[in-house]
Amino acid sequence: MSSAHKKINAWVWVAVVFAVCAVVYGVLSSYPRELAVYSDELRYLDVARSLWQGRGLRVRNMPSDYQKILYPLFILPALALKTTAAQITAIGWLNALYASSAVFPAYALCRATGQNRRRTVFLVGVVALLPTMSAASTFMSETVFLPLSLW
């Protein structure tokens, strides 16, 4: 088997790990929520909604100089859905996708640093099972910043 073929197979394996993680974390994030309690979640959702509606950066319908807009930009696709419940569920699934995508840069880092296959499997597995992945069940920017920090 050629080296290029082995690399393709390894990337397929990483893609399977990503898909499994995304489904598991997506299912775990699909529970009824009450947003009235968590101020960060409300702020992210308010900023995303104001951006979606073309009203600029607003928090509770008031102009804001809020600077943490990367995560609200990432949850914008969920706002295309009609009901708040559907939007919240979609955000949970988007978070699961974003957090699970950390396995790709983890694998690339292992390959770039010359780790052997056994260590690579271990390290990618650790990233896939990090307790930080539980952030996918909330509206937390960590779901976006974990994969970005690995790149």
Where does each model-flagged region fall?
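Transmembrane-helix motifs of polytopic, lipid-linked glycan transferases
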Residues: A90-G114, W151
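Transmembrane signal-anchor helices characteristic of membrane glycosylation enzymes that use polyprenol
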Residues: N9-Y38, A128-L129
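Short, Lys/Arg-rich, polar N-terminal cytosolic tail immediately upstream
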Residues: M1-K7
